[in-house]
Amino acid sequence: QRSLVGSEMCIRDRKRIEAAYPEKADIIKKALDKISGLEKAGEGNVDMPAEQFGIIMSQILLMKDDEWKDTLIKTGSALGRFIYILDAYEDLEEDNKKGRYNGLRAYSQRPDYDAFVENILKSLMAQCAAAFERLPVIENANLLRNIIYSGVWTRFELCRNKRELKTKNESQSENPGKTY
């Protein structure tokens, strides 16, 4: 019952937003369709669907066509790509178990997988931060900087630590007499 009410509210909100911002809604729908197509095709380059999610985030951040448009697009693009790749990093094990698409699967057997993903995420967040710093943000600037410079890393650290612990536990169960 509760989820039915929630979904009806979402549909109503979506229709209202689509009516208010038809061009944005069209761009977002096209990007979602591209993500869906790339995922169904098993795209091995994680940046392809991540780029589409960056387009979605750009449209969310972009309120009007003014002098800050390009900077907002750069901020949103990097942030969206970061979110998509971080989500893939977090979901990799479960996606593998359930046979679902994950854009990082092709890279996951690399011995430096965690560092590889971390470097991608650092590069994306550096792009996001550089673009953000060009914006004339006054309200909540410190809060936003805190999120950009440290808050976004909380989830990555949690995921990486969980992966490292699992790897260590698996290694210990395979070699019970060995100390680490």
Description of each model-found segment:
Residues L61, I83-L86, F132:
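A structural signal for well-ordered alpha-helices, especially hydrophobic packing surfaces
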Residues K40-L79:
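Alpha-helical phosphate/pyrophosphate-handling elements in metalloenzyme active cores
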Residues S150-Y180:
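Acidic, carboxylate-rich catalytic segments that either coordinate divalent cations
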Residues Q1-G6, C10-I11:
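Single conserved hydrophobic/aromatic residue that forms the stacking wall/gate
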Residues I11, A20-Y21:
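Nucleotide and nucleotide-moiety/phosphate-recognizing core
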Residues L92-L158:
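Accessory, usually C-terminal, subdomains that scaffold auxiliary metal cofactors
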Residues L32, G76-G80, K122-M125, A129:
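Generic structural concept
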Residues S7-E8, D70-E94:
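Active-site alpha-helical segments that house and flank conserved acidic catalytic motifs
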